[in-house]
């Protein structure tokens, strides 16, 4: 539109309002894309029957116990985040702007959501279990000489597991978290053998992390981060 002889550009997008969606104008295509993806996701969550209750009923007792100790405030919030991760895995970079495009996505999500949620919840249960193992390993290392590397290990753990980590990490990268957590446990177990070696490695990682944050990255990742930032984060 034009105002006072100037051209004003605005980019419309669906906006996630929690229990509903609205339309809002944004100043940049990037902000538009981030908001629109979240808005489409919310519409999809409202448009498909949720299999959450069914999946919860079929969890093993062990899975229920592990999931109850997640970093999320409630198990319901954890399952909501798992649903979002499952939907994002189907939607990908698609940006539906018409009813037909949205209905195509809705049908694709509906066709896979039950199996996808089962798989995601089972994986998240493994991840949380390994996170507990990592926490125990860190707590069990009590040498005063290891305070700095143990604090670094704690920081790494908290950058992997936090409220919202499932959807922000995404279904594809979630599969790598057990490997990262195993590596963290191995690091803590081996700290006492050669703390000098660990300090060298820690300094190298810190230097890379500093460059990452200077370029706009954050630990943990923030929702809506640019693709280049996401790629760089998982290179650390």
Q: What are the functions of these language-model segments?
A:
Residues 221-236:
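C-terminal tails and terminal domains of large nucleic-acid-associated
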Residues 209, 213, 232-235:
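Short, intrinsically disordered, charge-balanced linker/junction segments flanking boundaries
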Residues 1-209, 217-220, 227:
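Acidic, serine/threonine- and proline-rich low-complexity intrinsically disordered segments
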């Amino acid at each position: 539109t034009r105002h006072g002889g100037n051209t004003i550009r605005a980019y419309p997008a669906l906006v996630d309002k929690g229990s509903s969606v609205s339309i809002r104008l944004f100043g940049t295509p990037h902000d538009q894309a981030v908001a629109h993806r979240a808005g489409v996701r919310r519409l999809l969550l409202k448009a498909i029957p949720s299999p959450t209750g069914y999946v919860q009923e079929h969890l093993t007792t062990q899975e229920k116990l592990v999931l109850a100790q997640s970093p999320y405030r409630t198990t319901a919030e954890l399952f909501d985040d798992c649903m979002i991760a499952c939907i994002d895995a189907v939607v990908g970079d698609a940006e539906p702007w018409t009813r037909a495009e949205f209905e195509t996505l809705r049908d694709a999500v509906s066709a896979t959501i039950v199996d996808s949620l089962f798989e995601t919840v089972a994986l998240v249960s493994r991840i949380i279990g390994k996170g507990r193992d990592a926490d125990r390993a860190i707590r069990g290392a009590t040498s005063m000489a290891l305070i700095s590397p143990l604090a670094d290990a704690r920081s790494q753990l908290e950058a992997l597991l936090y409220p919202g980590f499932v959807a922000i990490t995404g279904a594809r990268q979630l599969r790598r978290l057990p490997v990262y957590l195993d590596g963290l446990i191995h690091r803590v177990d081996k700290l006492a053998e050669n703390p000098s070696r660990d300090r060298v490695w820690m300094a190298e990682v810190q230097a890379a992390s500093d460059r990452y944050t200077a370029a706009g990255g954050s630990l943990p990742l923030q929702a809506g981060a640019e693709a280049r930032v996401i790629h760089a984060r998982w290179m650390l």
